[in-house]
């Protein structure tokens, strides 16, 4: 919106007529001083002055995109643990999540889908939480955490953490969960984000931004190179993200098949973070160490930016920097974070054959 303020004034200069005085000179001769000519009246107009007030655009904290509905900005982030077992596919909600973390679990992967700017009714299938979720998701400012099942040690740790427990055992009696009749247990537990948000505590707070974003006219860092795809070996799953220049997004495949959601839409994201971490163990479960530092590849706007990730506290967002030490800026939109083991990904450059590129 523009505000215009205009000041106009005419400056007029009054005419001045000066009459000469008759002065007697010596010798009796007198001269009359000629009258000075009247000064010309000049009208001057000051140019119009325009003042523009720019109203800042309100953006969603987890996407950097303009907020379509500002009334939802104060609600908390909602994390849903989504199953990736072959019998759980296709899933509901992966293309509606602002962020998705893919984690290694026992010989498979699982998704931590983070909703804030929009929801998904239904969402799922929903499976168990893991000890690694506590630190990995800790920067989202006490988010709601929807999950189902887990051993007593993990359950106790989650309930004592900064994650707000909305597990099946807590929220099912309040109408938070239901079984999908077209699927078999345990791959058929689903929920509605609308209902889960309604169960948020009164003091719930919105998430803080997790990344820095480029302006629309801002170029990607020069510390980048063109890319067409990345191939990633996760536990029990082969993942590929391929740049689609027509859609201006990265599209996902797993196990050499296009990964589509329940609406038959290809799973996609504007940014893909491939973050190398050390995985420890807790019993039989892997535990990603998400505090510290390591190598990162950030795929955005059709390029690869290589650099490092760093995090000193689990309640702080990850900091991603390129090889020059500058913070990597993301493209506004949805982001996937692949939490991988070291040396589990390859980049595929323009001119290379995607089909011939082998998974690491």
Predicted regions and their residues:
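A surface/extracellular/periplasmic glyco- and lipid-processing/surface-interacting theme
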Residues: 33-43, 47, 51-97, 101, ...
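Juxtamembrane helix-loop transition sites at the ends of transmembrane segments
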Residues: 1-2, 134
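Hydrophobic helical h-region of N-terminal Sec-dependent signal peptides
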Residues: 15-20
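Bacterial signal peptide processing site
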Residues: 27-30
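C-terminal motif of bacterial Sec signal peptides marking the signal peptidase cleavage site
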Residues: 22-25
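Bacterial N-terminal signal peptides that target proteins for export
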Residues: 3-13
């Amino acid at each position: 919106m523009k505000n215009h303020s205009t000041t106009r004034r005419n400056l007029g200069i009054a005419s001045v007529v000066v009459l000469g005085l008759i002065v007697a000179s010596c010798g009796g001769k007198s001269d009359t001083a000629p009258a000075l000519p009247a000064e010309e009246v000049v009208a001057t107009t000051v140019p119009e002055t325009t003042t523009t007030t720019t109203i800042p655009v309100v953006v969603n904290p987890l996407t950097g995109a303009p907020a379509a509905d500002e009334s939802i900005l104060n609600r908390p982030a909602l994390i849903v643990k989504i199953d990736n077992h072959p019998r759980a596919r296709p899933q509901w909600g992966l293309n509606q999540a602002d962020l998705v973390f893919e984690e290694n679990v026992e010989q498979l992967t699982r998704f931590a889908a983070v909703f804030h700017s929009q929801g998904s009714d239904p969402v799922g299938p929903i499976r168990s939480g893991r000890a690694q979720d506590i630190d990995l998701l800790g920067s989202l400012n006490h988010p709601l955490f929807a999950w189902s099942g887990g051993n007593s040690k993990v359950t106790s740790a989650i309930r004592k953490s900064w994650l707000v427990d909305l597990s099946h055992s807590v929220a099912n009696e309040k109408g938070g969960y239901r079984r999908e009749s077209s699927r078999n247990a345990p791959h058929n537990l689903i929920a509605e984000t609308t209902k889960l948000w309604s169960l948020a505590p009164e003091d719930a707070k919105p998430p803080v931004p997790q990344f820095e974003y480029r302006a629309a006219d801002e170029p990607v860092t020069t510390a980048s190179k063109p890319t067409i795809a990345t191939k990633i070996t996760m536990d029990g799953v082969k993942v590929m993200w391929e740049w689609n220049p027509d859609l201006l997004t990265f599209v996902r495949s797993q196990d050499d098949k296009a990964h589509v959601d329940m609406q038959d839409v290809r799973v996609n994201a504007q940014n893909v973070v491939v973050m190398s971490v050390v995985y420890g163990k807790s019993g039989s479960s892997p535990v990603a160490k998400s505090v510290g530092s390591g190598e990162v590849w950030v795929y955005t706007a059709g390029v690869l930016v290589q650099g490092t990730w760093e995090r000193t506290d689990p309640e702080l967002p990850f900091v991603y920097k390129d090889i020059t030490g500058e913070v990597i800026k993301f493209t506004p939109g949805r982001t996937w974070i692949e939490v991988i083991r070291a040396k589990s990904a390859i980049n595929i450059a323009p001119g290379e054959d995607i089909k011939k590129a082998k998974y690491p």
